Regions:
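Generic protein-terminus/edge-of-domain signal
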Residues: 1-60
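Short acidic-glycine-tyrosine-enriched beta hairpin
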Residues: 55-71
Length: 110
């Protein structure tokens, strides 16, 4: 069985950033298999029929799609059966430490 290349993405999120928001209109939605240490929340509009791959999971996306990718998780996207040329992608990237801060804040209010 052949090996699959996994790209190590260097995100624009700096250690000093709390989070980073990127809004990108796209004519197609494909991205090779990659990994990065940051968590990523992806919201997509008009990408029905595209495929998302996270770890061993392969799923076809709906018209509206929301996906949380854990830091270190291998993931990719493929246009597959997506016919739209008017795709909106909004990505929020953040460090795992933000989850710790938020969960500590919520627990302290209980």
């Amino acid at each position: 069985m052949g090996s699959v290349d996994v790209l190590r993405e260097i995100t624009p999120l700096s250690p000093e950033d709390c989070f980073l928001v990127m809004q990108r209109p796209k004519r197609s939605f494909s991205y090779p298999l990659h990994v990065h240490p940051e968590f990523e929340l992806n919201y997509l509009e008009n990408a029905a029929g595209a495929i998302r791959i996270v770890g061993d999971s392969v799923e076809e996306m709906e018209e509206l799609d929301l996906l949380l990718v854990a830091g270190g998780a291998k993931h990719a996207y493929s246009n597959h059966k997506c016919l739209s040329t008017d795709i909106l992608e909004i990505t929020i990237q953040f460090h795992a430490s933000l989850l710790i801060v938020l969960s500590t804040s919520v627990i302290s209010r209980l």
